[in-house]
Regions:
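Core catalytic alpha/beta fold that binds nucleotide/phospho-ligands
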Residues: 1-130
């Protein structure tokens, strides 16, 4: 197995939370049902940092695949996992097609938040396609 790509993204939690408050439809556009299931989203003080980290994970996934993916929806990348569990990426649609065409067989995700920032790091591996 070979590392095919690495992506990282960082999000300012307060700025991201303000954007969600200003534009209520943004939350539905960026996040699907899997993204919004975790218990930590029920606590208002944790929801902003959790959603910011999930958005960073989506951006990091796109970067790990090389970016420039046309015909994708933000719902094509969803993050699963409850507090204390290893988060996982669920791919579908255009992003899943791009991953398959690139030879991706597994993804690895790490997310964190501190000091008002949320960060996500994604590694994709598999067998390169020619």
């Amino acid at each position: 197995m070979t590392v095919l790509g690495v992506g990282v993204d960082i999000v300012d939690i307060e700025r991201f939370t303000r954007a969600l408050e200003r534009t209520p439809a943004l939350r539905q556009r960026l996040f699907g049902p899997v993204d919004t299931q975790p218990q930590d989203l029920a606590a208002q003080d944790l929801a902003g940092q959790s959603l910011a980290a999930r958005f960073a994970a989506k951006e990091a996934m796109l970067k790990a695949l090389g970016g420039n993916i046309s015909g994708f929806s933000w719902h094509d990348i969803q993050v699963t996992g409850e507090r204390g569990q290893q988060p996982k990426l669920v791919l579908s649609g255009g992003v899943a097609r791009r991953a398959a065409l690139s030879g991706v067989t597994s993804t690895h995700l790490s997310m964190s938040h501190d000091g008002g920032m949320a960060i996500a790091f994604v590694v994709v591996d598999g067998e390169p396609r020619s």
